Structure formats: structure tokens, C-alpha cells
Design a protein with these regions (language model features):
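Extended amphipathic alpha-helical segments with heptad-repeat/coiled-coil character used for oligomerization
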Residues: 124-153
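Alpha/propeptide regions of enzymes that mature by internal proteolysis
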Residues: 82-116
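Hydrophobic transmembrane signal anchors and adjacent membrane-proximal interface regions, especially
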Residues: 71, 94-95, 149
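Short, solvent-exposed loop/turn segments at the edges of secondary structure
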Residues: 55-57, 88, 126
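A contiguous strand-loop segment
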Residues: 1-81, 117
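Surface-exposed patches in mature extracellular/periplasmic domains of secreted proteins
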Residues: 107, 118-128
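An acidic- and aromatic-residue-enriched active-site/binding cleft used to recognize and process polar
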Residues: 4-6, 67, 111, 136, ...
Length: 153
């Protein structure tokens, strides 16, 4: 998987490496201290890598692509009201790539996921995206829409 991230202008994105075991403190899904390393294109804001796309050390890659007018995300539920992992859409790429070595493992995580519309900040609102996740054996597309989370081969 690869792409050139061709835009007419730059958002300040840069090649970004997240080393193994860099602490991710996800907004709703807690902290992860032990995980795979990542490399990809990201805009780094307040020390946090907002990945456009990335690949982990196991060869699992993920890209967030425009899905304007179609993407819809879940509202955050109070703790204890859901048994699913609640992940903000801007954290989706590192949440998958830090924990999964394959598309098969990603599918398992997706079966327990609530993708939320939590914005990174007032200056960086929620993006309308869908995602491609691929390894050497498989590729899926993940879309969060009004009628739920969809996974396509």
C-alpha cells in the first residue's frame, strides 16, 4: 500500500515515526504503553501524531481517505454504558496499528469498536473519512455511517 498524499497545499504533514512503547493516551480507550512501532505521514499537534496513513513494524498498513458527506460517527457513551472500545476517529489509525499485526487481528478489534466523532480540538474538527487496512494477505475498507460501522473486503 502506498500513496503520495498529493494536495494543492500542505497542512504541515511530515514523515512521522512512533517508536515501540511510546505512550498513547487515547481519549476514551485508555492508555497503551506496549505496542508496535509505526511510520507514516502525520500532522503532529501538541505532541500527538495525527496520522493520514501509516504502517507498523509487522507490515500492517492503514490509510484514512476522504468520505465527505457519507461519514457519521457515534456519540461517546458514559463509561459503563457500552462493552465496546470507544475510539475517536482521529485516533483510529494508531489504535489499530499499535495493537494489530494483521487484517485478521484488525477485524477482531473492529467487532468491538464504537468509532466516535470526538474532535482533536476546536481548531482541528472531526474529519469525514473512511479507511483502508491492508497486509500482505488481505485488504479491507472500514466505513462509519449513520447505520453503523461497515467492513468490506
Amino acid at each position: 500500500m502506498g500513496r503520495t498524499l498529493d494536495y494543492e497545499f500542505s497542512y504541515g504533514e511530515e514523515i512521522t515515526i512512533t517508536p515501540r512503547n511510546y505512550e498513547f493516551d487515547f481519549r476514551h480507550a485508555g492508555k497503551i504503553n506496549t505496542h508496535y512501532a509505526l511510520i507514516g505521514m502525520a500532522f503532529v499537534s501538541e505532541g500527538y501524531p495525527l496520522y493520514y496513513d501509516a504502517v507498523n513494524e509487522k507490515g500492517l498498513g492503514m490509510a484514512g481517505l476522504n468520505f465527505v458527506g457519507n461519514a457519521a460517527y457515534e456519540d461517546v457513551l458514559p463509561e459503563g454504558e457500552t462493552d465496546r472500545d470507544q475510539v475517536a476517529q482521529f485516533e483510529f489509525i494508531p489504535w489499530i496499528l499499535t495493537q494489530c499485526a494483521s487484517v485478521k487481528e484488525a477485524r477482531e478489534k473492529l467487532s468491538k469498536l464504537r468509532l466516535t466523532g470526538t474532535a482533536f480540538s476546536k481548531q482541528l474538527p472531526t474529519s469525514q473519512l473512511h479507511w483502508m487496512i491492508a497486509d500482505k494477505d488481505a485488504c479491507i475498507v472500514v466505513e462509519s455511517m449513520k447505520d453503523g460501522l461497515h467492513v468490506y473486503d
